[in-house]
Amino acid sequence: MKIGIITAMSSEQKQVAQLLENKKEYTEGPFQYTEGSIRNNTIILMKCGIGKVNAAAGTVELIRTFQPDCVISTGVAGGIDSCLKIMDVVVSRQIVYHDVWCGEGNMYGQIQGLPARFEGNATLFDCAMSLDTPTAIHGGLICSGDKFITDRSELNDIKEKFHEGLAVDMESGAIAQICYIYKVPVSYTHLRAHETT
């Protein structure tokens, strides 16, 4: 299987790259790649940059250049549910934009003409949730938008709109949207690395 993995920052890319065998690193245009393998899987690891535009551009480039069988978005996120502790892992069953409003006839977070929420691939979700690890793994909704959320009033606004939201990040919504358009299975796995609750 060929797996595309997308991170936003160099620190995230380096941590994932440590797991790869037969590594080679290179740059194509604005994007940094590490290509390698895990068991019998070919891994294309990309650093796309922070935010939705970088994530969307990187995902398109990854899909068009490498034709991965699936895409995994991974990195750090802010926890917005009190059940989460720092260093817990959140795997998305769904993802939603917390900063999109297209007017009447659309749900908050929905881009007109697209689903209100993007679904994570069920097989990838089940695989992640079944891992035998001492780290706590939570599955649910990730809220994505172009802002690093630290203000309590903004957090409360997100929680009011998306009661079941577990974490916030800045890239997964765009990655999900591109994978939906290109019909590529996608999963989002994030480490809760800072306090927002």
PLM feature segments, named:
Residues 8-11, 50-57, 66, 84, ...:
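Conserved active-site and cofactor/substrate-binding residues in soluble primary-metabolism enzymes
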